[in-house]
Amino acid sequence: MILYSHLSTLIDIDLSNNIFLAKLPEAYAIFDPLVDVMPVIPVFFLLLAFVWQASVSFR
């Protein structure tokens, strides 16, 4: 428990185990849903490569 309290002071661990990286300013709060989806966009490009190759029969 002492180690946890020491680490929590160094790293500021959230007790609810949520990963909290940053919060957008209030003026940009309407973009929160878009920002939540943005990390997944590169995966779509990877999947697009497979769909493209399937459409040309993996030539």
Swiss-Prot record:
Residues 1-22 form a propeptide. It holds the Pfam family PsbK. The keyword Transmembrane applies. GO terms for cellular component: chloroplast thylakoid membrane; photosystem II reaction center. It is a single-pass membrane protein. It is found in: Plastid, Chloroplast thylakoid membrane. One of its GO terms (biological process) is photosynthesis. The chain crosses the membrane at residues 30-50. Belongs to the PsbK family. PSII is composed of 1 copy each of membrane proteins PsbA, PsbB, PsbC, PsbD, PsbE, PsbF, PsbH, PsbI, PsbJ, PsbK, PsbL, PsbM, PsbT, PsbX, PsbY, PsbZ, Psb30/Ycf12, at least 3 peripheral proteins of the oxygen-evolving complex and a large number of cofactors. It forms dimeric complexes. This is Photosystem II reaction center protein K. It comes from Chara vulgaris (Common stonewort).
